[in-house]
Amino acid sequence: MHIPDGFLTNRIAGSLDVVSGATILYAARRVKVDFSGRMVPVMGVLAAFVFAAQMLNFPILGGTSGHLVGGTLLAILLGPMAGFLTMSTVVIAQALFLQDGGLVALGANVFNICAVTCFSGYAIFRSLGGGSSGGKRLALIGFIAGWASLLFSSACCALEIGISGAIPLRIGLSTMVGYHMVVGIIEGMLTAGVLTFLFKVRPDLMKINGPGRFGLADWVGSVVLVVIPFAILVLAGSSRLPDPLEKLLAVSPLLPTGAGADRLYSSTRYMDYLIRAAVFVVLIGLGILAGFLGRRRSSRP
């Protein structure tokens, strides 16, 4: 759902750059005031997990593929502001290091992928009573929140490219929302599964201001959590089919003559993406580990 450069008007791209930038600054101030230092490693680990998990594309209808977004999950675990800030870090890193989405369109991508999923998913989760639920009810509410947030995100994306003239608005809305009704099922299932698992093994992580401590066992589990998506990539591979937005933009009149979905999603681009993503996740892990060791050293008398 990452919009490349050249498909949004300057007015829409610029407006969303301002909105997303202001929201990031506000969220950063809120997180600094509201959270203790113990949340920083949790945010880092979850960012690395979402970054890695988003590389796992699975085939869906019509020769397209989809992947986990994770905004609702992060908002539920960290709160909407910290979840949005963590998701924004992932999307900005993808744009800067992997060329996944354009730089001019970065504000639009942060708005669609981060703001819409985090805030709408969290609002749905809380309004349905997810914060005080457990078991099957927690799983059901998590599924609904994850599924619905992806529909809102895809609708916003379609509206932006449709109003910009990249694709007819009616076609864009029906295609994006229709495909993401299917992708949202996977999003909802993964959101529900992770919430149910954490509710059983680490219920303190389900509370933003919970007393839980991020200890050695959590670090080991976090490494495993981040390694799992890469292990699946190596052993089973990931679908190289274009995602719904790439499929849609491949027939846009704004695309240069002769270009198509294969050019937007070539195997060379895929391997280059995989290598740089692996390097980036390793750097994230080393940075978090260095911060953790530094905190332990400074806490010693």
Describe the function of each predicted region.
Residues 141-214, 218:
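Glycine-rich ThDP/TPP pyrophosphate-binding loop and its adjacent helix/strand module
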Residues 2-10, 14-73:
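Hydrophobic transmembrane alpha-helices
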Residues 112-153, 157:
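Short helix-perturbing small/polar motifs within transmembrane alpha-helices
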Residues 57-121:
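Alpha-helical membrane segments and adjacent membrane-interface helices in multi-pass membrane proteins
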Residues 155, 238-264:
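Juxtamembrane non-transmembrane "cap" segments at the membrane-aqueous interface
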Residues 29-34, 201-205, 288-301:
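Membrane-interface capping segments at transmembrane-helix boundaries
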Residues 17-29, 49-54, 119-122, 146-157, ...:
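Hydrophobic core segments of alpha-helical transmembrane domains in multi-pass membrane transport
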Residues 4, 263-286, 290:
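Individual transmembrane alpha-helix segments
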